[in-house]
């Protein structure tokens, strides 16, 4: 039983590294330069979900299937905890989580063929999630670079450490 608890703790620690990496990416001030207002929780959450969708897209494989499912579960549990900390009640949290899950799955679907899309198609996809942002083309370039950088690193790299964008 000791070994099992230890391995669960280690895996949770690894998953928190991925969660924290995604949070760090979504806090990148450069992402918000074309926003004509103060950023808010919803903006940061949208960027978190977009980053996470690209992360899953890049590392999706049969051999990573189980661990990516655990990372997915862990990240959405962490999001739920964050929403609770803001002070929402249970019913409100359930509604919000359903909205966020639907948003996430829409993003996953929209970026599935990202590398095959033209720049204008990418602009259209991102702008549907980032309506208040002006210079979406900068964000398209950012996410192209982000995916390129993900492809240069292993999943294990993100499990082991927290990086700053």
Task: Kindly label every feature range from the protein language model.
Residues 1-165:
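Surface/interface-facing alpha-helical segments and adjacent flexible terminal/loop regions used
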């Amino acid at each position: 039983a000791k070994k099992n608890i230890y391995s669960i703790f280690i895996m949770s620690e690894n998953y928190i590294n991925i969660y924290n990496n995604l949070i760090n990416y979504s806090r990148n001030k450069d992402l918000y330069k074309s926003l004509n207002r103060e950023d808010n929780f919803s903006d940061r959450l949208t960027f978190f979900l977009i980053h996470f969708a690209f992360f899953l897209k890049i590392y999706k494989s049969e051999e990573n299937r189980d661990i990516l499912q655990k990372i997915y579960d862990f990240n959405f549990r962490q999001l739920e905890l964050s929403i609770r900390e803001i002070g929402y009640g249970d019913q409100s949290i359930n509604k919000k989580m359903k909205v966020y899950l639907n948003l996430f799955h829409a993003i996953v679907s929209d970026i599935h063929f990202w590398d095959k899309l033209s720049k204008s198609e990418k602009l259209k996809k991102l702008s549907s999630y980032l309506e208040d942002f002006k210079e979406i083309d900068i964000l398209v370039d950012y996410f192209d670079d982000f995916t390129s950088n993900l492809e240069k690193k292993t999943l294990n790299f993100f499990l082991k450490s927290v990086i700053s964008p």
